[in-house]
Amino acid sequence: MNTVLFGIKGCGKTTFGKLVAKKKGCAFIDTDILIEKIYQINRHKKLSCREIFKEAGPLTFRALEYEVIQSLQDVQNSVIAVGGGAMLLYENVEALRKKSHLIYLFLDQEVLKKRVLAEDPLPVFINPNDPESSFDKMYSERDDFYQKITNQKLDITSMKEEKIVEKICEMTKSVKQ
């Protein structure tokens, strides 16, 4: 059984995914890295996910996300960090759910907003003319949806790093293989 960590940008999916994988002694997979590799192979151009989204557009980016998630069907006993937007597509959620325990890393809206709006340049999903409102709208929509699709939600707002890793490991111990 895999452990899938997902949540809104800036919640720590990659950071905690690496730490949990190390503690469990298993592989760590970051779907963003795989998207970048596939794009580089297909287009002979090395770009970050943000750059791919901007250059190729949201449809191409979501198609790459879908391709990556479908390619993980035979992966077992791994920790997988999945970009927040990927979880908005039903087919991605269902593909991951087959062999994975989905954990939503919840972080307080104001904490995340501060992190995300401090990025330069702003993420592509933020309207530069009204960054706070666009973040609040995105957060509200995704949080509602994520709570419906997750197996478990972990509120990491006031938790220390070690405790977060410990809690994720505990959550996955009781899951049937």
Predicted feature descriptions by range:
Residues 8-11:
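P-loop (Walker A) phosphate-binding loop of NTP-binding proteins
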Residues 22-31:
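Post-Walker A helix-loop "phosphate-sensing" segment adjacent to the P-loop in P-loop NTPases
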Residues 33-85, 94:
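ATP-dependent small-molecule kinase phosphotransfer cores
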Residues 5:
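Hydrophobic anchor at the beta1->P-loop junction of P-loop NTPases
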Residues 99-143:
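A glycine- and Lys/Arg-enriched "phosphate-lid" helix/loop adjacent to the NTP-binding pocket
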Residues 14:
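Walker A/P-loop
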Residues 19, 23, 140-177:
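NTP-dependent small-molecule kinase module
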Residues 84-86, 108-110, 159:
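Short glycine-rich anion-binding loops that position phosphate/pyrophosphate groups of nucleotides
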